[in-house]
Regions:
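N-terminal binding-site loop/beta-alpha segment at the start of enzyme catalytic domains
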Residues: 1-92
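Active-site mouth loops of central-metabolism enzymes
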Residues: 23-37, 101-117
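Active-site beta->alpha loop and helix N-cap motifs at the rims of alpha/beta catalytic domains
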Residues: 97-99
Length: 117
């Protein structure tokens, strides 16, 4: 039996993959996958194991001037995942916006344009 959760109109597995560590270190998480192919392999392994929710954000990036790094990585992994169109249709990629980074600083940017790209 697979546990699922509803996110809006979507039903996904109860366990998702938080992709932030694939792009940036934190105070609790000092490591980062330096190898892009290894990071993509992690995402592929999660999808192959049945994970249907990938969590990303434009602020998940190795540095202040590489915003969008994680979203690009997740998109590349999703596109290169060898799955059927039916399997791909079940995947939800959740992203967030509204936080921006300047050199050495994080700040809020809660304006509609930040969601439009």
């Amino acid at each position: 039996m697979t546990l699922t959760r509803k996110i809006g109109p979507y039903e996904v597995t109860a366990v998702g993959l938080g992709c932030m560590p694939l792009s940036m270190a934190t105070d609790r998480n000092k490591w980062i996958l330096d190898d892009r192919e290894q990071a993509i392999s992690v995402i592929h392994a999660a999808l192959d194991a049945g994970v249907q929710l990938l969590d990303t954000a434009d602020i998940y990036a190795p540095s202040w001037n590489s915003m969008g790094h994680n979203e690009i990585l997740v998109g590349e992994a999703f596109r290169s995942w060898s799955a059927t169109p039916e399997q791909k249709a079940k995947i939800v990629i959740a992203t967030k916006g509204g936080i921006t980074r300047a050199k050495g600083d994080n700040s809020l940017l809660s304006i509609p344009a930040s969601a439009r790209g």
